[in-house]
């Protein structure tokens, strides 16, 4: 139905349309009244958030939560903090500084955030956060408390009174042995200089003896247990270490040292004139005066096959004992009356080895109560040639030579005889 209304005029009989009030044009000077649009109800929309916690520079396994949006614009950091406080306790989120992962140019970066900052999604509605552990302001102002709370603690900081006297630690020098090919011992066993000199000397001797082939254990005489104890003040500024000379390396198959070379070296050491006990302390001689197994073996086989021509000056002029390379040990000069006393002196200076009644060697190398059976016999021509070179010898010389060849036991009868002569 049309809204127009026709009316008749008296002048002319035709109809004129009439406009309604709704369609009347308003004047342009009149302002329109703005009415506020209706607010849509806010729906509790949740978005997924993945966050990492960084402790000591390492990222933990990722955590997943759902955060409710408080604004239509998107996610804010305060929404995440409120959610973490509800789930993991109040103050948990304040222990970390938060940053969000976002795209930047052709890659991704961590965008540091404050509490009121907007969080940009990575892709679509994907949010990734990282929480880095922060230090408290009181810990930063007090560095001592920072050291106590850190995971790497100094044990001396826990007891400052105990460690105030010895602030300077003992110096420990370590030496790497590069000449051993079979066994690679990276470090020697070392001891601090704060120990007493007696204890450190015993430990060094024990450690050195375990690294040699001398495994035998013998009961030490009472005289050898008495040692001079030096003042510990002379060892204050010295570091105790085992050098390469003090430890004999383990034997190897490729070692050029043969049995003959070892015996010659022992011959040079043993056949010297009588000196002080400190002069004989070498690699083959222990500090207590006893000898190594190689030196004892040299004494057993020295009266026959091995030659000592290359051992240097071996003539003992003071005692009257001379060694011949082929014939063994013979007494060349000396009075016949005190022959036994001279032999005793020679045996005491010959290596200074004193055998006891209960003393034994590893492997039962020698038994003092049994006679040694010669393994090899010389031919008659060799014996004749040797006799022609040596010249005539008396029976006394032969008896004394045989007596000097063997290693006697403890000279008890001689001592008793001397005591009887003095009384």
Curated annotation (Swiss-Prot):
- UniProt-annotated location(s): Cell membrane
Q: In which tissues is it expressed?
A: Expressed during embryogenesis and in roots.
Keyword presence, Cell cycle: yes
Region feature DIX-like oligomerization domain, mapped onto this chain: 45-136
Q: Where is the composition biased (Polar residues)?
A: 196-211
- Keywords from the named record: Cell cycle, Cell division, Cell membrane, Developmental protein, Membrane
Species source reads: Arabidopsis thaliana
* Free-text note regarding domains: The DIX-like oligomerization domain is required for polymerization, edge localization and biological activity.
Record membrane topology: Peripheral membrane protein
UniProt-recorded name of the protein: Protein SOSEKI 5
Q: How does it assemble?
A: Homodimer. Forms long polymer filaments with other SOKs proteins polymers (e.g. SOK1, SOK2, SOK3 and SOK4) crucial for polar localization and biological activity. Binds to ANGUSTIFOLIA (AN).
Q: Where in the sequence does UniProt note compositional bias of the Basic and acidic residues kind?
A: 19-33
Q: Briefly, what is this protein's role?
A: SOSEKI proteins (SOK1-5) locally interpret global polarity cues and can influence cell division orientation to coordinate cell polarization relative to body axes.
């Amino acid at each position: 139905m049309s809204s127009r209304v026709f009316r008749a005029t008296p002048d002319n009989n035709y109809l004129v349309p009439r406009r309604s009030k709704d369609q009347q044009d308003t004047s342009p000077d009149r302002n329109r009244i703005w009415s506020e649009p209706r607010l849509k109800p806010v729906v509790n929309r949740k978005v997924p958030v993945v966050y990492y916690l960084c402790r000591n520079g390492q990222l933990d396994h990722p955590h997943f939560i759902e955060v409710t949006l408080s604004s239509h614009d998107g996610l804010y950091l305060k929404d995440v903090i409120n959610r973490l406080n509800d789930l993991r306790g109040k103050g948990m989120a304040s222990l970390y500084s938060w940053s969000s992962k976002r795209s930047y140019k052709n890659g991704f970066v961590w965008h540091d955030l404050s509490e009121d900052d907007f969080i940009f999604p990575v892709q679509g509605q994907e949010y990734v956060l990282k929480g880095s552990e922060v230090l408290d302001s009181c810990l930063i102002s007090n560095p001592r408390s920072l050291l106590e709370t850190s995971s790497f603690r100094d044990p001396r900081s826990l007891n400052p009174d105990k460690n105030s006297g010895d602030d300077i630690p003992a110096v420990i020098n370590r030496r790497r042995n590069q000449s051993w090919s079979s066994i690679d011992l990276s470090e020697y066993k070392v001891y601090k200089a704060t120990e007493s000199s007696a204890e450190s000397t015993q430990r060094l001797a024990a450690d050195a003896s375990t690294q040699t082939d001398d495994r035998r254990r013998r009961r030490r005489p009472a005289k050898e247990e008495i040692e001079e104890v030096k003042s510990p003040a002379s060892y204050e500024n010295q570091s105790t270490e085992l050098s390469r000379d003090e430890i004999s390396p383990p034997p190897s198959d490729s070692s050029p040292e043969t049995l003959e070379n070892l015996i010659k070296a022992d011959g040079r050491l043993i056949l010297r004139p009588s000196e002080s006990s400190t002069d004989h302390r070498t690699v083959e001689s222990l500090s207590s005066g006893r000898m190594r197994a190689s030196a004892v073996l040299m004494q057993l086989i020295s009266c026959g096959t091995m030659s000592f021509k290359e051992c240097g000056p071996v003539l003992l002029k003071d005692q009257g004992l001379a060694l011949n390379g082929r014939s063994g040990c013979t007494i060349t000069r000396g009075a016949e009356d005190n022959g036994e006393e001279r032999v005793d002196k020679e045996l005491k200076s010959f290596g200074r080895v004193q055998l006891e009644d209960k003393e034994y060697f590893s492997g039962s190398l020698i038994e003092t109560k049994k006679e040694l059976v010669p393994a090899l016999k010389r031919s008659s021509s060799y014996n004749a040639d040797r006799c022609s070179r040596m010249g005539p010898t008396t029976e006394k010389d032969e008896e004394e030579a045989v007596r000097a060849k063997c290693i006697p036991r403890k000279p008890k009868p001689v001592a008793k005889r001397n005591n009887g002569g003095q009384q």
